[in-house]
Curated annotation (Swiss-Prot):
Organism: Ureaplasma parvum serovar 3 (strain ATCC 700970)
Membrane topology according to the record: Multi-pass membrane protein
Function: Catalyzes the transfer of an acyl group from acyl-phosphate (acyl-PO(4)) to glycerol-3-phosphate (G3P) to form lysophosphatidic acid (LPA). This enzyme utilizes acyl-phosphate as fatty acyl donor, but not acyl-CoA or acyl-ACP.
Gene Ontology terms: cellular component: plasma membrane
Protein name: Glycerol-3-phosphate acyltransferase
Length: 257
């Protein structure tokens, strides 16, 4: 009976409760909060008017910009990890024997809502960032190996194109599908035993389609949030970024975070 209760509660946790608190935590937009606390100004009123790292650097400097990046990355790591801790220690990591489904994979579901909260924060009139750093944090929890490849990919594309927005969109799309490649799709909270991971790829495949879908939704939202950047790139009006310095022209649309 306890096992059945834990299984039911695990579904309620991962599909209802986790998305709720993940969205609320995601809505705590670091750039807006930091700019209001330390500068008494809303970063969304200046420059690109975007609530993200790049605009924070442009408006308030590198220190607050880097702190914004760190806090945005931490948000999905916190929400997914919190869900996993509750799932494992409070509910004793139940396994739905009725269909052979390992519910551990569902702890990642809330990560999507962290990104949604960041982009559409309830605390700030649903006007948030574009989800790049949050997507990166989510990817770290889903697959650290692919996340590392993603960081390298982002930097290489940025060095070549000088467009942060384009680099972010390409990297998100690339990493989303890269998790499907056997051998590098290690999912920490699902494949808990790293030493046996490579000897049971069939087990990996059972869960990878779920996280792939979660990442696909997240990457699609990220790209959608960059719709103005896509237009700016097409008309050659997008701002160019050189690491933490930006080249700008008058009346250009926002870059990305």
């Amino acid at each position: 009976m306890d096992q059945v209760y834990n299984i039911v509660m695990a579904y309620i946790l991962t599909l209802i409760i986790s998305p709720l608190y993940s969205y609320l935590i995601g809505s705590l937009n670091a750039s807006i909060i930091l700019s209001l606390v330390f500068k008494k100004q809303d970063v969304r009123l200046f420059a690109s008017k975007n609530a993200g790292m790049t605009n924070m650097i442009r408006v308030h400097g590198k220190k607050l910009g880097i702190l914004t990046l760190f806090l945005d990355i931490i948000k999905p790591i916190t929400t997914v990890s919190l869900t996993y801790i509750i799932y494992k220690y409070a509910l004793d990591a139940p396994f739905d024997l009725s269909n052979g489904f390992n519910q551990a994979i569902l702890v990642y579901f809330g990560g999507i809502f962290t990104i949604i909260g960041h982009c559409y924060p309830i605390f700030f009139k649903f006007q948030g960032g574009k989800g790049v750093a949050c997507y990166g944090g989510f990817l770290i929890t889903v697959d650290p190996i692919v996340a590392l490849i993603g960081i390298i990919t982002l930097l290489v594309i940025l060095l070549i194109t000088k467009y942060m927005s384009l680099s972010a969109m390409i990297t998100a799309t690339f990493t989303c599908f890269l998790v499907l490649v056997p051998g590098i799709n290690y999912i920490p909270y699902y494949n808990q035993n790293f030493t046996t991971y490579f000897f049971d790829l069939n087990y990996v495949i059972k869960g990878i389609w779920y996280v792939w879908f979660f990442l696909l939704v997240s990457a699609s939202l990220l790209i959608y949030r960059h719709k103005t950047n896509i237009l700016s790139i097409a008309t050659k009006q997008e701002r160019k970024t050189i690491l933490f310095h930006t080249k700008s022209k008058d009346n250009l649309s926002d870059v990305n975070k």
